[in-house]
């Protein structure tokens, strides 16, 4: 079982609508006011999670309760964002493959926290991918292969989530790398905007890396 989490950031509604249409068996979780975006594409979620501070509409919540949507309401004063609570709910339900729409947008603090959430739950056995119109973002551990035809856009970038990682090899790309340190302080931009040149990319490295597949 997989989950689609829809949060309150910027969303390409056509991208979201197409993804939901292609993954009809997935559990859909709406976070706080993201329900207004799902309404625009006529999608009813299975679960709604949040403190609903940006959706002070009891009538709307009652409507979804009557549609047998599970409403999980949290106190606005809490130690976790609504997005993290939605991910946590999915993981506690045994879901290990999660995609998130709306995790990026105007609020960089929320966007950055959402990226860090990827690593937290990777260590708990869950694979989470953030999508927007231009980016596909996820965490990988130790080794990685990606076929060129499956790349989200033209570019692929790698970032350390541990301060430093050792890259044994990065092959099949425009800028191959062998036996180098990925260092957020010394070389923060060394691993950005690479391109797959062979049929596939292959990488071997220590620890966890954040991967960003991008298009212009």
Task: Please state what every model-predicted region is.
Residues 1-64:
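N-terminal beta-strand-loop-alpha-helix module at the start
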Residues 6, 29-32, 72-73, 129-132:
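General beta-strand structural signal in soluble alpha/beta enzymes
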Residues 67-75, 125-129, 154-159:
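A glycine-rich helix N-cap at a beta->alpha junction
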Residues 71-92:
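Short phosphate-binding loop-to-helix
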Residues 108-119:
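Short Gly/Thr/Asp-enriched flexible loops that form oxyanion-binding sites at enzyme active sites
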Residues 119-148:
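Class I SAM-dependent methyltransferase SAM-binding "motif I" and its flanking Rossmann-like core
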Residues 140-216:
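Long, charged alpha-helical interface segments
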